[in-house]
């Protein structure tokens, strides 16, 4: 595996996803009526931008690629890999339950990353993607 194809660790992936959720929260607060839907769209499509990088991944220098070919993540792959977080995000509008569901989805996903020899979470398994570090 070349330097460019080094798998990203849990800490870097968590930092990138946290930055993405901060961006989503800012959009939700700034544009209340459509902010939720804009946030959902970004959550689902974000990894398809910038050659396989959401804004959070771009800042942390991570990239989502196909597990087999190492080609950048497509919008289709992004939707598939982030559908698990999107399912939790949809419950966000339900007081308390939304927070709990999103928290449980996040814990499940990050636990799977730790338990996977390839560092793949459920969303990665569904989409056939991995997250790598870049220069």
Per-range role (PLM):
Residues 1-135:
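Membrane-interfacial and juxtamembrane segments of integral membrane proteins
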